């Protein structure tokens, strides 16, 4: 049986950290931003890690940070945009808890994430489109999908909390049967 960990999945700019912090407060659970955990553990920003050690090393650090959550319970975890694209990470996440894909159209992401040279994998619009196209099939394997384009962060939290209430009331036999929260 999976433990009580909720993983928020999605592209940069969809609000995983904002929603995660709000959801954790609502539930009385701990909130963990995986990128911040990596930065704290390695005393470097994500940008510095990419610049000095490369993406491959960063992805190893990401997997290690996920493995460090194995004994945790009652946590809401905001994943970095690329964490769920790794098969090993998806397997770890499925073993530890449940994933919610915060789905948002590209145009909204573009408005939320203007070109930002501090983001290691996002330098221009075509690059963003390509990266999203590569990651989307992985995001879509999440346990649940929530279309967030017309929702406030509080509205997203409400949707996740409603789903969790269904789990605890026993109205859902098995989490993962229903993949859409929209």
Task: Enumerate the predicted regions with their spans.
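ATP-binding Walker
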Residues: 14
